[in-house]
Amino acid sequence: MDLQAMRREYGLGSLHREQLEADPVKQFEKWMQQAIDSNLLSDPTAMTLATVDAEHMPSQRIVLLKGYDHTGFRFYTNKNSHKGQDISENPQVALHFAWLPLERQISIIGSAVPLDDDDNDRYFHSRPKESQVAALASQQSRPVESRDVLESHYQSLLKDYENTEVPRPQSWGGYCVHPKQFEFWQGGQHRLHDRYQYSKDRENWRITRLQP
């Protein structure tokens, strides 16, 4: 397979300094809304979460953005999972949105802070009951003998909680990533991409154009 021969050109647009919001969260919101309105992405909220464990080994996976504001960017997971363990050992993480049909990427670096029980309960019980039961049934990242074993356990729990509220597992909850740095990337012709980095300077954000 000759991957080196594969070529594509970027030409959907450009990104100029005067087009940027002074506030990176507002810039993120602008691009997120455009991504949603484009109907070109199956899920614009899907983002790569990169973590590093105590042995300095990196790992990454796709999670879903469930909310954001000037405090940070929120997602939910099983805290006993690989990513949860990584975050407990090293809260410095990176988020990455790859909106390839729009020739855009957003990178965010920050610290992941656990959400409180009230927030976790509120979101957990807003989910479909089937999803709540699935969270209860799965010991995420642990070995399982077969799919049948997992399905059988799930169906048993689904029956148990058919007419009662599903308790949120203590291992299930969310994190808020407090951003320290953003980068907005727009594909450009001849690989001369437009890149802008937002870096926190005390209470303000400093915007720097980066070479592609």
UniProtKB/Swiss-Prot annotation:
Disulfide bonds: none annotated. Its EC number is 1.4.3.5. Keywords: Flavoprotein, FMN, Oxidoreductase, Pyridoxine biosynthesis. FMN binds at residues 61-66, 76-77, 83, 105, 140-141, 185, 195. It comes from the Bacteria. Pfam families: PNP_phzG_C, PNPOx_N. One of its GO terms (biological process) is pyridoxine biosynthetic process. Its cofactor is FMN. It catalyses: pyridoxamine 5'-phosphate + O2 + H2O = pyridoxal 5'-phosphate + H2O2 + NH4(+); pyridoxine 5'-phosphate + O2 = pyridoxal 5'-phosphate + H2O2. Substrate binds at residues 7-10, 66, 123, 127, 131, 191-193. Catalyzes the oxidation of either pyridoxine 5'-phosphate (PNP) or pyridoxamine 5'-phosphate (PMP) into pyridoxal 5'-phosphate (PLP). Homodimer. This is Pyridoxine/pyridoxamine 5'-phosphate oxidase. It comes from Idiomarina loihiensis (strain ATCC BAA-735 / DSM 15497 / L2-TR).
